[in-house]
């Protein structure tokens, strides 16, 4: 199945503890239906020192967010939108913003 959310997309969180925050998709986990978004769902992890060069301590790590809790930001209107697909005349399948009907990529 084609991905509606891809790496590099600007998204907004529409549900959950981070509701309203915007960020860029760093990684998509299709097997889990989740995505890692910059600045969203940040958790603190306690790590041990590994070897001589690496330091232990508390690090902040972005955790995955379920795809149903994020919405793509329409590049034209700068508002959250759903994503559809359309096949162009030259045969390419592209993503389309449902609100503005504009092509997102391609």
Swiss-Prot record:
GO terms for cellular component: ribonucleoprotein complex; ribosome. GO terms for molecular function: rRNA binding; structural constituent of ribosome. One of its GO terms (biological process) is translation. SUPFAM superfamilies: Translation proteins SH3-like domain (SSF50104). Keywords: Ribonucleoprotein, Ribosomal protein, RNA-binding, rRNA-binding. PROSITE patterns: RIBOSOMAL_L24. InterPro entries: KOW, Rib_uL2_dom2, Ribosomal_uL24, Ribosomal_uL24_CS, Ribosomal_uL24_KOW, Translation_prot_SH3-like_sf. Belongs to the universal ribosomal protein uL24 family. Part of the 50S ribosomal subunit. One of two assembly initiator proteins, it binds directly to the 5'-end of the 23S rRNA, where it nucleates assembly of the 50S subunit. One of the proteins that surrounds the polypeptide exit tunnel on the outside of the subunit. NCBIfam families: rplX_bact (TIGR01079). This is Large ribosomal subunit protein uL24. It comes from Acidiphilium cryptum (strain JF-5).
